[in-house]
Swiss-Prot record:
HAMAP family named among the record's database cross-references: GMP_reduct_type2
UniProt xrefs under SUPFAM superfamilies: Inosine monophosphate dehydrogenase (IMPDH) (SSF51412)
UniProt keyword list: NADP, Oxidoreductase
Signal sequence residues: none
Protein name as catalogued: GMP reductase
Pfam families noted in UniProt: IMPDH (PF00478)
GO molecular function terms attached to this record: GMP reductase activity
Catalytic activity: IMP + NH4(+) + NADP(+) = GMP + NADPH + 2 H(+)
A single cellular component GO annotation: GMP reductase complex
EC number: 1.7.1.7
Gene expressing this chain: guaC
InterPro entries per record: Aldolase_TIM (IPR013785), GMP_reductase (IPR050139), GuaC_type_2 (IPR005994), IMP_DH/GMP_Rdtase_CS (IPR015875), IMP_DH_GMPRt (IPR001093)
Length: 327
């Protein structure tokens, strides 16, 4: 019975420290392997139009970070793959499940991307399973990420269809309102859903949504994630593609969900919203701070690398980390 499993979210968990075995936090290794490739951090900026564009994708790839390019400028995807490969960089793109995407995937045989993410809101669907099989038939060497899902059954079905990784999270993101509009989702219990799904997984799990602090990255890894997709923490940078807005002398960046009317261009099946975030410096500074905080997490875990985070004990204390404070 589902109701027998513990239900909690990021703010309800504290990880319990172990004896530190490194002399400096800088010795902690935050690298992660996904498919045939190693990356500096187990984080992925969300593949959303206000988070990533081709310039940021190139920057991330050159600096050794993983990225997933969004699918909302469909005609630019093949030229993007070509441009990345000409620079000796990996190409990581997104596709949907509409009929014309099948022809697009087949057309990639001559210049095959290393990663393809099947990106739809409700990933436990026959349409996603069919697309996984099509990609694996046409492009067998491509690493396929599929999502989004929220149950062990979904993880097993997508893995059995050929997915190399599944993306877990239905509506926990800051600009996602799926749980309000539909009554469904993992909002409010995303970390427990991750734990539930990871126990069923044989391949990589990507936690997607609900990350509000850098410590949540360590918690995601503790509960089974190989990688963590993050939206709001990667939004609002000077180079972010979101529109810059000035309000009372302060600058803000637009940040909106992939299922918002601003993304769709129409008010139909809307499950996202738009917010303004204060502009917060450069993306590279955030990545550096994330790495330093994750190195500190590893030191508290008593290890030398990310694997040490998977074995720490934890306590569930409802809303304990804030204790009335804010950051």
């Amino acid at each position: 019975m589902f109701n027998d499993i513990p239900v909690f979210d990021y703010e309800d968990i504290q990880l319990i420290p172990n004896k530190c075995i490194i002399t400096s936090r800088s010795q902690a290794d935050t690298s992660v392997t996904l498919g045939k490739y190693q990356f500096k951090l187990p984080v992925i900026p969300a593949n959303m139009q206000t988070i990533i564009d081709e310039t940021i994708a190139e920057q991330l790839a050159k600096e050794g970070y993983f990225y997933i390019m969004h699918r909302f400028d469909e005609d630019s995807r093949k030229p993007f793959i070509k441009r990345m490969h000409e620079q000796g960089l990996i190409a990581s793109i997104s596709v949907g499940v509409k009929a014309y995407e099948y022809e697009f995937v087949t057309s990639l045989k001559e210049d095959t991307p290393e990663f393809i993410t099947i990106d739809i809101a409700h990933g436990h669907a026959n349409s996603v399973i069919d697309m996984i099989k099509h990609i694996k038939t046409e492009l067998p060497e491509t690493f396929v990420i599929a999502g989004n899902v929220g149950t062990p059954e979904a993880v097993r079905e997508l893995e059995n269809a050929g997915a190399d990784a599944t993306k877990v999270g239905i509506g926990p993101g800051k600009v996602c309102i799926t749980k309000v509009k539909t009554g469904f989702g993992t909002g409010g219990w995303q970390l427990a859903a991750l734990r539930w799904c990871a126990k069923a997984a044989r391949k990589s799990i990507i936690a997607d949504g609900g990350i509000r602090t850098h410590g949540d990255i360590a918690k995601s890894i503790r509960f089974g994630a190989s990688m963590v997709m993050i939206g709001s923490l990667f939004a609002g940078h000077i180079e972010s593609p979101g529109k810059t807005v000035e309000v009372d002398g302060e600058t803000f960046k637009e940040y909106y969900g992939s299922a918002s009317e601003y993304q769709k261009g129409e008010h139909k099946n809307v499950e996202g919203k738009k917010i303004l975030l204060p502009t917060k410096g450069h993306l590279s500074d955030t990545l550096t701070e994330m790495q330093q905080d994750l190195q500190s997490s590893i030191s508290y875990a008593g290890g030398k690398d990310l694997d040490s985070l998977r074995h720490v004990d934890y306590v569930i204390v409802k809303n304990s980390i804030w204790n009335g404070d804010s950051i």
